[in-house]
Curated annotation (Swiss-Prot):
Could catalyze the transfer of an acetyl group from acetyl coenzyme A (AcCoA) to an acceptor substrate and release both CoA and the acetylated product. InterPro entries: Acyl_CoA_acyltransferase (IPR016181), GNAT_dom (IPR000182), GNPNAT1-like (IPR039143). Keywords: Acyltransferase, Transferase. GO terms for molecular function: acyltransferase activity, transferring groups other than amino-acyl groups; N-acetyltransferase activity. PROSITE patterns: GNAT (PS51186). Gene3D superfamilies: 3.40.630.30. CoA binds at I74, C75, I76, G115, F116, Y117. This is Putative acetyltransferase BSU40680.
């Protein structure tokens, strides 16, 4: 398993296909809500692809909001879950943020995945709320050891 930063339009398109498969087709999110102004190669987000045996099976993005790294659109194709790739993705996103001298992180995690994020040091920081018909919570993490 490995992760790489997306640097080509082809890889960005691959990431979009993974997001479409997970969020739109599997979870029923409206496609109009899945893609936004941050989905560009040279914008404010850094996108990544996660690979299992050289096959792209997961993706995510991260952007800096204020003095916090906001982890977004974390997803893995269904048949590749439960192999530790989620931790690999989150670790990679956190490294990207730390490279910019920032040690605070946040994400809107699906409530059913909150336990996973808690194991990685995140804490629930909000009441449950709905995004695209799916329950979410705000989760935050401070990692001062990174600086």
């Amino acid at each position: 398993m490995n992760v790489k930063k997306i640097t080509s339009e082809q890889d960005l398109h691959t990431a979009f296909e993974i997001r479409k498969a997970v969020f739109v087709e599997e979870q029923g999110c409206p496609i109009s809500d899945e893609f936004d102004e941050f989905d560009t190669l040279h914008g404010d987000c850094q996108h990544i692809l996660a690979y299992h045996q050289n096959v792209p099976v997961g993706t995510a993005r991260v952007r800096i909001v204020g003095h916090t790294g906001k982890l977004e659109r974390i997803c893995i194709l269904k048949s590749y879950r439960k192999f530790g790739l989620g931790k690999v993705i989150v670790d990679a996103l956190e490294r990207i943020v730390k490279e910019q001298g920032i040690s605070a992180f946040k994400l809107h995690g699906q409530t059913q995945a909150a336990g996973f994020y808690e194991k990685l040091g995140y804490r629930t920081a909000s009441e449950e709320f709905m995004l695209d018909g799916i329950p979410h919570v705000l989760m935050t993490k401070q990692d001062d050891s990174a600086l």
